[in-house]
A protein has these predicted regions:
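A short, exposed loop/beta-hairpin motif centered on an aromatic-Gly-Thr core
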Residues: 15-27
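Short, mixed-charge low-complexity intrinsically disordered segments
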Residues: 18, 38-107
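A short, charged, amphipathic alpha-helix used as a generic interaction element across diverse proteins
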Residues: 24-43
Length: 107
């Protein structure tokens, strides 16, 4: 039975770090990776990310691994942009509310 080791790609310097976590089930392992990657998007709005992935024969060759990593990294960057946009939007709405409140106090 194949086991799946969790790896972490530090995007700041493209260093791959093997973790001590192993999974017996690929679906549990992939779900864990998705959740960890999603948490990175939500928590580190303006910081570099760690990207979680597995060692697995699920990928036939290095090109497939690179393609998959590239797709996932693009997904994370896209999610970051969406989150940043939402935060900027909330920030501008908050400033607008504060500005309206100050103007109301002046009247």
């Amino acid at each position: 039975m194949e086991k799946y080791q969790l790896y972490i790609l530090r995007l700041e310097d493209a260093k791959i770090i093997p973790s001590k976590m192993w999974f017996d089930d690929i679906y549990t392992a992939m779900e864990y990776c998705v959740l960890k990657n999603r948490a990175q998007v939500e928590l580190n709005v303006e910081q570099y990310y760690y990207f979680y992935f597995l060692n697995t024969s699920y990928f036939d060759n290095d090109d497939q691994i690179q393609d998959e990593l590239g797709d996932r990294i693009r997904f994370i960057i896209n999610e970051e942009e969406k989150l940043s946009y939402r935060l900027r939007s909330l920030r501008s709405k908050s400033l607008e509310v504060l500005d309206n409140k100050k103007q109301g106090e002046l009247i």
